[in-house]
Amino acid sequence: MEVNATLIDCCDPQKPSRVLFHFLILDAPSPSNLPTYIKELQHRGVRHLVRVCGPTYDATLVKSRGIDVHSWPFDDGAPPTRAVLDSWLKLLDTELARQQEDPSVPPPTIGVHCVAGLGRAPILVALALVEYGNVSALDAIALIREKRKGAINQTQMHWITKYKRRHQGAGCVIM
């Protein structure tokens, strides 16, 4: 059984060879494929798994393998809530600060999943591309859709095109 995963790298525009974040967009695991899913997360070096849908599996099994699980659900087809947005950016800021404090710390791989991996998970990754990079909202959507067909609906696209960045800085690209 294969895990449906799409890797997107966020790189520093001042130094494009420097990866700030690896994002892994996924669909939700089920109890039956959770062992395979966990192996894939470990193989990819995932340190954080962000679940933006309702629980479909026992998160303690993932946590027992050294992966932090963040459960920040929001409505299917909708943009993230303010609380989810704040939690997501706080996680990314914390990981970026770790790298700045110790340049030998490798960039984190952060898994993000919703039910199908087409709406809620990709919109958070698109937000990271916009927020931490010099990537426009439409370019972020196009980059994600190039790798993950059908990602991000019209409601989410409209929201991210109106989004105002909080940060100035690093750039993100698909590798």
From Swiss-Prot:
- GO biological process, alphabetically ordered: dephosphorylation
Molecular-function GO terms, alphabetical: phosphatase activity; protein tyrosine phosphatase activity
State the InterPro entries in the record.
Prot-tyrosine_phosphatase-like, PTP, PTP-SAK, Tyr_Pase_cat, Tyr_Pase_dom, TYR_PHOSPHATASE_DUAL_dom
Propeptide ranges, please?
A: 173-175
Q: What's the record's pH-dependence note?
A: Optimum pH is 6.
Reactions catalysed = O-phospho-L-tyrosyl-[protein] + H2O = L-tyrosyl-[protein] + phosphate
Keywords attached to this entry: Cytoplasm, Disulfide bond, Hydrolase, Kinetoplast, Lipoprotein, Methylation, Mitochondrion, Prenylation, Protein phosphatase, Secreted, Virulence
Which Enzyme Commission numbers does its entry carry?
A: 3.1.3.48
Q: How is its activity regulated?
A: Activated in a reduced environment which promotes the reduction of the disulfide bond between the regulatory Cys-53 and catalytic Cys-114 residues.
One family name in Pfam for this protein: PTP-SAK
**Subcellular compartments:** Cytoplasm; Mitochondrion matrix, Kinetoplast; Secreted, Extracellular exosome; Secreted
UniProt xrefs under Gene3D superfamilies: Protein tyrosine phosphatase superfamily
Residues recorded as binding substrate, renumbered to this chain, are 116-120
**Which Cys pairs does UniProt list as disulfide-bonded?**
53-114
Known outcome of mutating residue 114 to S: Loss of catalytic activity
Lipid attachment points, S-farnesyl cysteine kind? 172
Q: Does the keyword Secreted apply?
A: yes
Catalytic residues (positions): 76, 114
Domain Tyrosine-protein phosphatase residue range list:
15-172
Task: Tell me which GO cellular component terms the UniProt record holds.
Answer: cytoplasm; cytosol; extracellular exosome; host cell cytoplasm; kinetoplast; nucleus
Q: Which residues carry this modification: Cysteine methyl ester?
A: 172
Q: Which family does it belong to?
A: Belongs to the protein-tyrosine phosphatase family.
Functionally, this protein is described as follows:
Has protein tyrosine phosphatase activity and may act as a virulence factor to support intracellular survival in host macrophages.
Task: Please identify the protein, giving its name as recorded.
Answer: Protein tyrosine phosphatase PRL-1
The beginning of the lineage is:
Eukaryota, Discoba, Euglenozoa, Kinetoplastea, Metakinetoplastina
From the UniProt record, report the name of the gene that encodes this protein. Answer: PRL-1
